[in-house]
Amino acid sequence: MSNTIKMVVGLGNPGKEYEQTRHNAGFWFLDELAWKWKASFKEEKKFFGEVARAALPDGDVWLLKPATFMNRSGQAVAALAQFYKIKPEEILVVHDELDIPCGRIKFKLGGGNGGHNGLKDIQAKLGTADYYRLRLGIGHPGDRNLVVGYVLNKPSAEHRRQIDDAVAKSLQAVPDIISGKWEEATRFLHSK
């Protein structure tokens, strides 16, 4: 049986100044997943990002951290997907989510972009919204005028702990997600 998910994308912004910001929660997840799978990232200019290949028992899974800024993430996703002939429904995108309380997780296929510029660009470049999303809750600042500053700043120590806990819990669901056991993954991830 081969893997159902063939590419996992973590969204974030490149550069030291963004490393610890809420908007980079997808990168945090992908770094942990690469460590768990003993996969090493390498800069790949033709894919506009850092790429790692995880050789798993049921086939390779590609890990991608776009080196474009968030609003150009689709360029990297589409380049890797086209090169390796990966269909949108074989892609998992892991990203920060304002509309979910800090530390909570949601998993879904398709849907709107919720104003997330990375998702908007991925949808535009793939021509569809039908890819999987692992949404890591970062909470909302309470006022939409504060959103940009909120996502581009470091979380408090308590919020960082909650996000790290969500990443750890999400990693436990990865085997089910990769193998297409959607109901099991959803039930686990959506439980408190």
Swiss-Prot record:
GO molecular function: peptidyl-tRNA hydrolase activity; tRNA binding
InterPro entries linked: Pept_tRNA_hydro (IPR001328), Pept_tRNA_hydro_CS (IPR018171), Pept_tRNA_hydro_sf (IPR036416)
Entry annotation: catalytic residues: 23
Keyword Disulfide bond: no
Domain of life, source organism: Bacteria
Pfam families with a match to the protein in the record: Pept_tRNA_hydro
Keyword Hydrolase set for record: yes
Site residues (Stabilizes the basic form of H active site to accept a proton), renumbered to this chain: 96
Enzyme class: hydrolase
GO biological process assignments: protein quality control for misfolded or incompletely synthesized proteins; rescue of stalled ribosome
Single GO cellular component term: cytoplasm
Site (Discriminates between blocked and unblocked aminoacyl-tRNA): 13
EC nos: 3.1.1.29
CDD domains: PTH
Catalytic activity: an N-acyl-L-alpha-aminoacyl-tRNA + H2O = an N-acyl-L-amino acid + a tRNA + H(+)
Keyword vocabulary terms for this entry: Cytoplasm, Hydrolase, RNA-binding, tRNA-binding
Subcellular location: Cytoplasm
Family the UniProt entry places it in: Belongs to the PTH family.
Function: Hydrolyzes ribosome-free peptidyl-tRNAs (with 1 or more amino acids incorporated), which drop off the ribosome during protein synthesis, or as a result of ribosome stalling. Catalyzes the release of premature peptidyl moieties from peptidyl-tRNA molecules trapped in stalled 50S ribosomal subunits, and thus maintains levels of free tRNAs and 50S ribosomes.
HAMAP family (UniProt xref): Pept_tRNA_hydro_bact
Quaternary structure, from the entry: Monomer.
Name of this protein: Peptidyl-tRNA hydrolase
Gene: pth
